[in-house]
Amino acid sequence: MSSGPVQPAASDATDEAQSEPIIELAGVDFGYTATPGVRDVTLQVDPGEYGAVVGPNGSGKSTLMQLMLGLLKPDEGIARLFGEPSHEFDDGSRIGYVAQSASASKEMPITVREVVKMGRFPHVGFGRLSEEDWEIVDRSLDTVGMTAFADRRVTKLSGGQRQRAFIARALAGEADLLVLDEPTVGVDAESVDAFYDLLETLNHDGITILLIEHDLGAVVDRAERVVCLNREVYFDGPTTEFAESDALSRAFGATASVLSDSQ
């Protein structure tokens, strides 16, 4: 009989993992040589949240996102991702990242199914997918409403369809966190509404959603939480309280009525 410590029950370990913050930033500073970055950022993203980082162009949103995802290392402070130092985190399957350029990826000469297949690579490598892997790919396509387009080349898709294809890739990777950088740039208004409906459904299914946006109107009716950034955090709280705060005028140089008019 082992005399080592008693291991926690599997359910206890699962509960602990589910309660652990996905993203933690504490006193984070980062600066570039020629331009400022972000300063003294402290925030936490918990499992199941639907949040948005908003700010004017050049406010440091992309820098903050890269710090969150471990693509940049803070000059000062602590950045953690799934409990590990962000810049050391290496389980890419847990994160689905949809770049702004995804909607403009017209040059990709591959099919939608091949794009979604890439989501399985962190799990199985670059070899042949098993029958179970292909079932996951097909379920992911179905979830985002792209089954009928599975064999269509990405070059033949609309902007909204391309975004759905890249979300399906993240779902095929069984991601816990979905990060979308300006996801509706170049997408028509009707497709934007359907796109955000999809994100809401995925969030209800347990996926944590984080939007990076400069378009306030795109998130004010959808995200539950807003982090307003202009080099530093001006507001972090429920979306319903954002328009009533002074963060809007301080960060955007605008009044709350502008936000109301954009809805």
What function would you assign to each model-found segment?
Residues 225-239:
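H-loop (His-switch) and adjacent beta-strand-loop-beta switch element
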